[in-house]
Amino acid sequence: VTPKGCPMTDLLKTSLNRRTVLQAATVGATGVSPALRALVHAQGSDAPEKKEVKIGFIPLTDCASVVMASVMGFDKKHGVTIIPTKEASWAGVRDKLVNGELDFAHVLYGLVYGVHLGLAGPKKDMAVLMTLNHNGQAITLSKKLADKGAVNGAGLARLMAAEKREYTFAQTFPTGTHAMWLYYWLAANGIDPMKDAKVITVPPPQMVANMRVGNMDGFCVGEPWNHRAIMDGIGFTATTTQDIWKDHPEKVLGTTSEFVQKYPNTARAVTAAILEASRWIDESLANKTRMAETIAGKAYVNTGVDAINQRILGRYQDGLGKTWDDPNHMKFYNDGAVNFPYLSDGMWFLTQHKRWGLLKSDPDYLAVAKAVNRI
């Protein structure tokens, strides 16, 4: 199964025409999916049951819609107060979602499915309420490899074959998106990530520091940490994830199925607020700049504004002298195309979990996606 030209993806996505997707994705009279609306109507009121919610996030550029929903007051407009809660690792986000310390999270798409199926950790029924962003991740390799001629995947494969030493690559969570992008890219270049390399898990904000001290040869992570590695002169961008799969799904708004059942109106209100923030971010250059200035602060990503702002505007450099304007940079709304939680997206992550041995047998792909993605 491949991201590009996947028949399953094409079939399911083309079954929803543009008008249907925009109706589902745009804040309006209903604001959220039919599944959530049905729960709301059963309750007889649309007032949020829980007025204050904690939403966990990892310091990454794509936490922006959660943060800006709070900062810009979109949450209050929908009758809730969002408290963005900075977390240290994806494992911590998982654990706090499962035990109820967090109500929602900005979270890796594949992580939600891993928890739902109990892969390498606790099992709990989960829910994806919306997709938070497309694109905007990358694979960074150490500058030391470029000095030896490994400036892309093919060059890396040749160098690994010649040196015959153990190579170490990092991703951010075993069932997460970054692991899947890394594995897919390595395999596409003839490198078996399960046999030909050592793969470790490192939280996103620690990637650059770990590469600086030589703990890994490369990593896959979200921005701004790939650009930060270039700014610090220790790494270069071997590929962006949008070059692997244009407009791929990335982070989602995740919660437990139990929370949605207990607080359907709150789930509706939070989804609507973050959707409105997503639209606001993508509306203008000025909004993106303000967003970058906000999330660069210590309470959120804690990095320089330039580390965020360049790639959020599509201004890329690879750290080896190449610069380009990428029209497929990180998007939060993109005229409503980003946010619908396609069943086919969830199913694709399941196929990759099976491909890399995280799932030992084939699940009912469609049934699992229907259980998790609230459409």
Please place each PLM-identified region on the residue numbering:
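Sec/Tat-exported extracytoplasmic proteins
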Residues: E101, H106-Y109, H116-L119, K143, ...
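N-terminal export signals
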Residues: K13-T14, T20-A42
